[in-house]
A protein has these predicted regions:
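N-terminal core-entry segment
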Residues: 3-256
Length: 256
């Protein structure tokens, strides 16, 4: 047995080592997204965000009628009164993470949600529910919500593309859930920053993305089921919920 008395602790066999190139790429993307988040939207961007919001709203109302969404919505009754975010399809309010879970599930229920072809994802199904839930809890104005959405879409697209898009599927993971967590976390970070009257920073985004990565989920097993698996619908809800939590945990200094 080797005795270590000084210096850094010994590395475990097979322990991952941070790739400098990946660290640099993450910092570069975070810096870009921070600039997007802190800049006012152009007229064209504002109109695009409004259309995405309207599209998500209509699709989600339809999706809220599906049995899986209704069951999860009713399951959230135990969380009624835990927050100020409306839970879609119910008459109660709950913590933003719970509201985002239900809304995200509804948004992805009919495969009519928006699609980013390169990263094989449905950004709005994860980003918009998370942003709306946090916006409700923080009483954010529409302008702040739209800016948060723009930053969330930018982050999800860039991070998803850098991760390889289809490669994620080949490894057995559902991109909407995995990448959606990052986009949702970004949008929520923006809303929290605006509420505090602060700028979105690169380091804060990186912290939130670290928590999003730690929660990454969504297996492609549903695609192997003979009749398909409706758990796929919940994957967007997971992405939305994880993003809300990632943004909150990014502000906890001891949780890094």
């Amino acid at each position: 047995m080797t005795e270590h008395t000084t210096g850094a602790p010994p590395r475990l066999a097979g322990e991952l080592v941070a790739d400098p190139a990946s660290v640099e790429l993450t910092a570069s993307i975070a810096g870009h997204v921070a600039r997007v988040a802190n800049a006012p939207l152009t007229g064209a961007d504002t109109e695009a965000a409004r259309k995405l919001l309207l599209d998500n709203f209509i699709v989600s109302l339809w999706g809220a009628t599906r049995p899986w969404t209704r069951e999860i919505a009713q399951w959230t009754r135990r969380f009624a009164g835990t927050g100020a975010s409306p839970v879609l399809g119910t008459d109660w309010l709950a913590d933003p993470s719970i509201a985002a879970l239900v809304h995200g599930t509804a948004a992805h229920s009919y495969e009519l949600d928006d699609t980013h072809d390169e990263i094989l994802s449905h950004p709005g199904a994860a980003i918009i529910p998370a942003a709306l839930a946090v916006a409700a809890a923080t009483d954010a104005p529409q302008a702040d919500l739209l800016r948060a959405l723009a930053a969330g879409y930018e982050a999800m697209a860039l991070l998803g593309a850098s991760a390889g898009g289809m490669e994620t599927v080949h490894r057995g993971f559902h991109p909407t859930s995995v990448f959606g967590s990052f986009g949702a976390a970004t949008a929520c970070i923006c809303l929290h920053a605006r509420q505090r009257g602060e700028a979105v920073t690169r380091d804060l985004l990186i912290a939130a993305w670290g928590h999003a990565l730690s929660q990454a989920c969504g297996a492609m097993q549903f695609s192997a089921e003979p009749g398909g698996g409706e758990v796929k619908r919940v994957h967007a809800g997971y992405g939305a919920r994880n993003g809300v939590l990632a943004a909150e945990f990014a502000h906890l200094p001891a949780v890094t």
